[in-house]
UniProtKB/Swiss-Prot annotation:
GO biological process terms held by the UniProt record: photorespiration; reductive pentose-phosphate cycle
Binding site for Mg(2+): K201, D203, E204
Protein name, as recorded: Ribulose bisphosphate carboxylase large chain
Gene3D superfamilies for the chain: Ribulose bisphosphate carboxylase, large subunit, C-terminal domain, RuBisCO large subunit, N-terminal domain
Known partners and oligomeric status: Heterohexadecamer of 8 large chains and 8 small chains; disulfide-linked. The disulfide link is formed within the large subunit homodimers.
Amino acid sequence: MSPQTETKASVGFKAGVKDYKLTYYTPEYEVKDTDILAAFRVTPQPGVPPEEAGAAVAAESSTGTWTTVWTDGLTSLDRYKGRCYNIEPVAGEESQFIAYVAYPLDLFEEGSVTNMFTSIVGNVFGFKALRALRLEDLRIPNAYIKTFQGPPHGIQVERDKLNKYGRPLLGCTIKPKLGLSAKNYGRAVYECLRGGLDFTKDDENVNSQPFMRWRDRFLFCAEAIYKSQAETGEIKGHYLNATAGTCEEMMKRAVFARELGVPIVMHDYLTGGFTANTTLAHYCRDNGLLLHIHRAMHAVIDRQKNHGMHFRVLAKALRMSGGDHIHAGTVVGKLEGEREITLGFVDLLRDDFIEKDRSRGIYFTQDWVSLPGVLPVASGGIHVWHMPALTEIFGDDSVLQFGGGTLGHPWGNAPGAVANRVALEACVKARNEGRDLAVEGNEIIREASKWSPELAAACEVWKEIKFEFEAMDTL
C-alpha cells in the first residue's frame, strides 16, 4: 500500500456489516424540541425484526450505509444520526408497524423542502429489507418552521385583497381542459365570473400548448377579469397556470401576470417541484400575487395505504414551501377523501396549532408559529346538491370549485355560475340562522330553487349523480 493512501483505519475501527439496530434503535431516547419527527408505516420482509426495520429506516435516511466505514470516526454519529425511538404494531394489519424516527435539525438545510425530502424519503424507500414503506406524518419543529416564508399571503390577507368575508369562495375549472382556443377560453372565463363566481381556473395540464399559447390565454383571461369586475362590482380572479418546463420560463409567466395586474397565479407543485414552487412563492409575496396550488401527481405518491407518503405530509410541505390555496379533496365528490382524515389535513393547512389526534391520522402535535394558513380547495365531481355538505364540512375558509358543475348547466356557463352562487348564499344564510345543513341541506336547496330558475335547472340535471365508492385512505 502506498504511504499516501495508508490510513490508521484499524485504530478503534472494525470493518464489516452489523445490524442497524445496534446503532440506530434507541428506545431510551428522549426526543428534543428541535428534532424533526417522522412516523413511518413499515412492512418488513419476512424474517426481518421490526426493530431492525425501523433502525434501517433511521439509518438509511440519515447517516447510515450498508457497512461500517472508518470515516464514522471523523464525526459525531451521536450528534447527527437519526434514531428509531419507538415501534408499535398497526391494529388490524399483519406485519405492519409504525416506526417513529427522530432526526437532528442539523441534518437539514434551512428553508429547503427539497433537502428535507431528499433525506427523509430518499433512497430508503427502495431498501430491500422492506416490503413497503409509507411516511404517515412529520412533526416540524419551530426552529425549522421559522426558516421558511410559507404561503405568500395567507387566508386573512387574501380575504382583505378580495374584500370577501363570511362565506366560502366559489371557483370553476374551465372545461374542456384541453383544446379550446385562447379567445373561447377567455369567453368561458368571463361568463363564469359574470355569473357570480369569485375565481375561474386553468386546469393543471393547461400550460402552453399549440392550440393555446400561454401569453394569448393570459391576455384574454385578463380581459375577462376586468370586464366582469366592471359589471359586477366584485373583485374577480383567474388562476393563470405559470407551470413550465424550466424555472426561468415559469418566472417569465408570473412576471407577465403581475404586469397584467391580475390577482392570482397557479402552480402544479409536485410536477413542477419544490424548488420551483418555493421560488415562485417568494416572488408572489414580493409582488402581491396570490398563489393557487394544484396537487397533480399526488395520488401516485399517496394513494397506496402501505407505501409512499400520506397527503398530510405533502400538505405540510406545501405550507412550508408556499401556496395560498391547495386542492384537498371533497369527501363527497368523485375524488378520494375520507371525511375525518381529510378534515385532519385541512386543519393542518389552516390552523396555527394542531393537537395530536390519531383518530384523524394526526400523529404529532404541530405548531405553525407565525406561518400563514392555506385555503383548502374542494374540487372534483361536485354540484349544487353537494353545496350544503361542502359548506358544513369545510366552513367559510375554503374554496369550493365546480368545473362540470358549472359548465355543464343546461342553459350555459353564466347560468351555471348563478346556480352555484345562489346555492352557496342559501346555505350560508341557513347556517347563520341556525339550521343544520347536514340534516336540512336538500330542503334548503329546494327552497332556494323556487326563486332561482337557474338553480332549479341545475337541481334537475344533477339530481341522480352520485360517486359512491369506498375510500382507500383509511386509518
